[in-house]
A protein has these predicted regions:
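Domain-level signature for proteins that mediate thiol-based redox and metal-cofactor handling
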Residues: 1-145
Length: 145
């Protein structure tokens, strides 16, 4: 995916996660939540987590925004569910580095799973904040965990 053309950000995975998100719902019994807003385009979301014994047992989000922000949030929630807080922080760092143009190893891309498909967005500055929204919200939410 590293050589994807700039115009090809709407991958099958992105469209699937946007059209049929598995993690877009209001969670009952969340242990923490945080709101994120992208003021430049109006994307907004509330990320909700249920953390037990240092493990993210459940992740969900609610909100509205463009296909990129919504798909990125769904991919992220899928990726971090079942992971430790520390691993989720590591994954956030990988994703935010990638979306800012940092080259990742194949192993790091595998760790990001479908979220690695958003790499081509790094070459579209106007869309970077859309892709980052959920991840930056997670970063802030986990900062004191």
């Amino acid at each position: 995916m590293a050589n994807a053309p700039v115009g090809n950000i709407y991958t099958a995975a992105l469209m699937q996660h946007n059209s049929h998100p598995d993690y877009k719902y209001e969670m009952e019994g969340c242990t923490c939540s945080h709101e994120g807003v992208n003021p430049s385009c109006g994307d907004e979301l509330t990320l909700q987590l249920r953390i037990e014994d240092g493990v993210i047992e459940e992740a969900s989000f609610v909100g509205s925004g463009c296909a990129v922000s919504q798909a990125s949030a769904d991919m992220m929630a899928d990726l971090i569910t079942g992971e430790t807080v520390e691993e989720a922080k590591r994954l956030v760092g990988l994703f935010l580095g990638m979306i800012k143009g940092k080259a990742l190893s194949e192993e790091d891309k595998e760790d990001l799973d479908e979220a690695a498909e958003l790499e081509s967005i790094s070459r579209m500055p106007a869309r970077v904040k859309c892709a980052e929204l959920a991840w930056r919200t997670l970063e802030k939410l986990l900062a004191d965990k």
